[in-house]
Amino acid sequence: MYAIVRLRGQVNVRYTIEDTMKMLRLHKVNHCVLVPENPHFKGMVQKVKDYVAFGKIDANTLAEILENRGRLEGDTRLTEEYIRENTAYDSIQAFAEAVVNGETTLKSVPKLKPVFRLHPPRKGHAGIKRTVQQGGELGDHGDGINALLHKMR
């Protein structure tokens, strides 16, 4: 499962890239979405790679994001009780592990918003004009996306 975080704004962005961002529901900076690893999303991520950070998320980071930034309709927080009542899982951690392993999806939680509005990273970005290979934040982080998401929790 990919975690995709928008790092750059929408000024002077080509229409096709902005359209792909809309399809991914990345309308604003510091918004994060989770998408499955399949050829359709891989192509979309490849198209917007110069404006986002992405990588494979692990279960602990997903659980942390669900606890801190998970919101339901009406802007209420996602709680352990809500997960227990509305899914087959006992905790947010167990649900996050199931999502990462592909046993369930985020859509199985009713009224869960698909976009996580993150905080800007604590201690700042490494740079939003350069790729990870050049010492910045843009592009494919691989497993390193978990460190960025922890900074943005």
Curated annotation (Swiss-Prot):
Q: Which Pfam families match?
A: Ribosomal_L30
Recorded hits in InterPro entries, A to Z, give: Ribo_uL30_ferredoxin-like_sf, Ribosomal_uL30, Ribosomal_uL30_arc, Ribosomal_uL30_CS, Ribosomal_uL30_euk_arc, Ribosomal_uL30_ferredoxin-like
In the record, biological process GO terms are: maturation of LSU-rRNA from tricistronic rRNA transcript (SSU-rRNA, 5.8S rRNA, LSU-rRNA); translation
Q: Tell me which PANTHER family the record gives.
A: 60S RIBOSOMAL PROTEIN L7 (PTHR11524), LARGE RIBOSOMAL SUBUNIT PROTEIN UL30 (PTHR11524:SF16)
What does the annotation say about its assembly with partners? Answer: Part of the 50S ribosomal subunit.
Query: Entry's HAMAP family?
Result: Ribosomal_uL30_A
Concerning NCBIfam families, the annotation shows: PRK06049.1 (NF004711), uL30_arch (TIGR01309)
- The protein depicted here goes by the name Large ribosomal subunit protein uL30
Species this chain originates from? Methanosarcina barkeri (strain Fusaro / DSM 804)
Please name the taxonomic classification of the source: Archaea, Methanobacteriati, Methanobacteriota, Stenosarchaea group, Methanomicrobia
